[in-house]
A protein has these predicted regions:
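Structural signature of extracellular appendage/secretion-system components
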Residues: 1-399
């Protein structure tokens, strides 16, 4: 009788574990359309054995059936890390794409007439003026096109600056989102740790919520996740701690011109603006390294917040921020050797200044979409105005 009951007991354990497995399958099917849900899998293991006989040659054990070892999530950490990296990279370039698309509107169909047409009209009227400088019609056409060009230039430049300032709002919103996600991850850490403390139950649904928060965080800023044995995670942003088991660290925004660490650590000397940048509230350290040009190899082209910063830049630029390569003097252009040597000495100094200015341009201007465009656009307009002035009012030596 005991043997029969023992076998029935073993069968009961099989039925029970099968029921658990069916419940897990049903749970998976119900949540197939649930965002962030991770498929769960039941792992089975042997129950304890009952020793019924033993001698010097063998031990005779009788199995007591099967039990559920755990219900685990079917996730691949490598796949998670890869997805978060590429999701962040997509968000980075999406932010820059949206900036470029907005800028194209300023130069394209702004006020129903693209900027290229305005330039062509101005150039045509200049040519006509050179042919018929005494014609009132030609002069009027030139003045009209010149006023139109000036108005368009002022409108485009003011639109670029206004767009830069408007990005402050997006930057503040994303910093707030990062802080909210950090708090969510921290709270879920505490709940998961409490549920799994007895090593009896797995907090799978809570982990799904945490993974959703981690996925969203990785799309905003480059993050690294470290899994702990107790089920909690630690999170790092750009090498700085964001979430630990004991606390969260907070980001805030600060005006670029008011952050001393940018001036000290990065040698940044950009003009004073009301542009905001993300910094760590605890020590004022900037979140991003302004001296680092983002690249895929270094995984520094990740996150929509970084994309916004690289789109906007840190200051308003103009043509003086674009270095002009000095022209080497020719000896034949000088009356004597002394004047030539003086010119060469000045040229050598100008080359040194040019190298320094070029380094500044490559670091603080060229990598930033709007800042670079402002500078290059100003160079174009400055050169055009100079040429117009030279054409209409040439410098002449009076003898």
């Amino acid at each position: 009788m005991a043997g029969t009951m023992g076998r029935l007991s073993v069968g009961v354990t099989g039925l029970q574990t099968s029921q658990y497995a069916l419940n897990a399958t049903a749970h998976n099917l119900i949540n197939t359309q649930t965002e962030g849900y991770t498929r769960q899998q039941v792992l089975l293991t042997d129950q304890s054995y009952n020793r019924v006989a033993t001698d010097s040659y063998y031990i005779n054990n009788v199995g007591m059936g099967v039990v559920t070892a755990q219900i685990r999530q079917v996730r691949d950490q490598f796949a998670d890390d890869t997805y978060r990296t590429e999701s962040g990279r997509m968000s980075y370039y999406k932010a820059q794409y949206e900036t470029v698309s907005e800028i194209e509107n300023y130069f394209g169909e702004l006020e129903g007439k693209d900027f290229n047409t305005t330039l062509n009209d101005m150039w045509t009227s200049m040519q006509e003026l050179q042919k018929e400088s005494n014609s009132i019609v030609t002069r009027s056409s030139f003045i009209s096109n010149a006023l139109t060009l000036i108005d368009r230039v002022q409108t485009i430049r003011s639109s670029l600056i206004e767009y830069q300032r408007n990005l402050n709002t997006e930057i503040k919103d994303q910093v707030k989102t990062v802080n909210d996600l950090a708090s969510t991850i921290y709270e879920l850490n505490q709940q998961i740790r409490a549920v799994e403390a007895g090593n009896v139950e797995k907090a799978n649904d809570l982990k799904d919520k945490r993974n959703q928060a981690l996925d969203k965080l990785s799309s905003i800023v480059n993050s690294e996740v470290v899994n702990n044995e107790d089920g909690t995670v630690e999170v790092y942003l750009e090498g700085h701690t964001l979430v630990t088991l004991g606390r969260t660290y907070t980001l805030t925004t600060q005006k670029v011109c008011e952050n001393e660490k940018y001036q000290q650590n990065y040698g940044f000397t950009g003009s004073s603006t009301d542009f905001l940048m993300p910094v760590w509230e605890q020590d004022g350290d900037p979140l991003f390294n302004i001296n680092r040009v983002p690249t895929a190899d270094s995984n520094s082209d990740i996150g929509s917040l970084n994309g916004l910063m690289m789109s906007r830049g840190y200051f308003i630029s103009n043509y003086t921020d674009v270095p002009t390569k000095p022209t080497k003097p020719l000896e034949k252009d000088f009356a004597n050797n002394a004047d030539y040597q003086t010119a060469m000495a000045q040229y050598e100094q100008d080359v040194k200044d040019y190298v320094k200015d070029l380094e500044y341009f490559n670091t603080y201007v060229e990598p930033y979409t709007i800042t670079n465009l402002e500078a290059q656009f100003d160079v174009l307009i400055h050169a055009m105005v100079t040429q117009i002035n030279d054409t209409l009012c040439p410098n002449k030596t009076v003898t």
